[in-house]
């Protein structure tokens, strides 16, 4: 559970960093760029710890996919960006892909033989 929380924090940090980049480019201030650098770095740190126990493909798909989905939605709400039917179709496909990747990944059951072999 702890590693899933780290992944959620990585996603939140990525979203915050990317939205800060847009905010900084619109407002012209340097604060947004500093926040962007800090949050993107934090996002990668959280992701690095999360993949210790979460399969890399699953973690990366969730990190990138949920990030893209929420960044797009927040961009529409905060920066008045357009949301076309084609973008909605793309986001829907993305969500379906994330669900398929997550549901297609099973946790490997470790046997006593594997543990004994690893200790040798």
Curated annotation (Swiss-Prot):
Q: Gene3D superfamilies from the xrefs? A: 1.10.3730.20
Q: What does this protein do?
A: Catalyzes the excretion of spermidine.
A GO BP annotation:
glycine betaine transport
Protein name, entry field: Spermidine export protein MdtJ
**Listed GO MF terms:** amino-acid betaine transmembrane transporter activity; antiporter activity; choline transmembrane transporter activity; spermidine transmembrane transporter activity
* Cited NCBIfam families: PRK10452.1
One GO CC term, this protein: plasma membrane
- The record lists the membrane-crossing segments as 1-21, 31-51, 54-74, 81-101
Q: How does it sit in the membrane?
A: Multi-pass membrane protein
Native source species: Klebsiella pneumoniae subsp. pneumoniae (strain ATCC 700721 / MGH 78578)
Family as reported in the entry's similarity comment: Belongs to the drug/metabolite transporter (DMT) superfamily. Small multidrug resistance (SMR) (TC 2.A.7.1) family. MdtJ subfamily.
């Amino acid at each position: 559970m702890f590693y899933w929380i780290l992944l959620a924090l990585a996603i939140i940090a990525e979203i915050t960093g990317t939205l800060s980049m847009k905010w900084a480019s619109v407002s012209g201030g340097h604060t947004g760029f500093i926040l962007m650098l800090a949050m993107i770095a934090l996002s990668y740190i959280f992701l690095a710890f999360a993949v210790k126990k979460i399969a890399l493909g699953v973690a990366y798909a969730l990190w990138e996919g949920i990030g893209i989905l929420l960044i797009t939605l927040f961009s529409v709400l905060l920066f008045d960006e357009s949301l076309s039917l084609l973008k909605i179709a793309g986001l829907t496909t993305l969500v379906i892909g994330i669900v398929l990747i997550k549901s297609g990944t099973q946790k490997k059951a470790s046997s006593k033989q594997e543990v004994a072999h690893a200790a040798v």
